Amino acid sequence: MPRLKLDVSVETLRLAQPFRIAGHVFETAEVVFVTLDDGTHRGRGEAAGVYYMQDDLAHMTQAIERARAEIEAGPTRQELRQILPPGGARAAVDAALWELEAARAGVPAWRLAGLTSVRPVRTTLTVSADTVEAMAARAVGYAHAKAIKVKLTGELDLDLARVRAIRAARPDVWLGVDANQGYTIGKLPELVRGLAAHRVLLLEQPLPRGREADLQGFDSVIPLAADESVLSLAELPNAIGRFDVINIKLDKCGGLTEGLMMAEQARELGFDVMVGTMIGTSLATAPAFILAQQCSIVDLDGPTFLVKDRLPSVVYRDGDLFSGDDVWGAASAAA
């Protein structure tokens, strides 16, 4: 097998408007872009990393450069899991290996993943934290959305007012909320009661990472999803008895290879499986679309926040997401 040529670059993506969550405001998204080619075929990958784990551009590019010789030697995707730890660096390289393998094999990446076909998936569209009025207006603006996720900030009365207004504006949609680690166990019972009154069907990451034990024995009428609390396959057991849903993000776990493994083990442990993404282009969304084929909840709206996406792009239509082979993972990708 010929040696691979690795190229690594970084890009700053402009957001159409600031994206607010508990404790953070994002105005741009910085991503690492990786290509691998063997002189005939090429694979590409993109990752934003995990901001709350200091997995930023510098960390990702340094990790990839340190492993350059091993990556250019052409490892398998499983071998890559031993070369790079979970995180954005591995996610970007993993995606490039998937696309390269698909091109070499002459089959789309989803077939390599064991699928016989792919279908559009229902995805949430996210309302970032803002004033009550602005958030309700944004929900109305998502006219074709069938599922909406609301970002909370840990301010109980304000958060419930936000949810109340959005539910009144959109009584028709599946509604979930993401607390982004903004609450304590002491406030959680009141939050859950208030959310249930407005038919909220998912509460994501209510407590800070590291406080998972506080949820042991907590009886919630709304399913609780682990995001920041479960980064990779090794952390899945920590969610048992504390969460109902596992939100798998390829930037967290290190790519589609481990993401598929996580989904399988999570189901075996009795969890529902959700797929999410960091803010990025369609190139980052496309590998997650393969995982989405196996998930009961899909939150893959990252490209919708950007001023400009890559072309070709994933397609959002009537509340659904579809990623064609031309976006990433085609059966033929010339170097």
Region annotations inferred by a language model:
Residues 1-175, 182-189, 193-197, 312-335:
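N-terminal capping/lid subdomain adjacent to the active-site entrance of alpha/beta enzymes
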Residues 150, 155-293, 307-319:
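Catalytic core of soluble alpha/beta enzymes
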Residues 303:
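Active-site cofactor/co-catalyst pockets and adjacent glycine-rich loops in catalytic enzymes
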Residues 296-299:
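Short helix/strand-capping turn motifs
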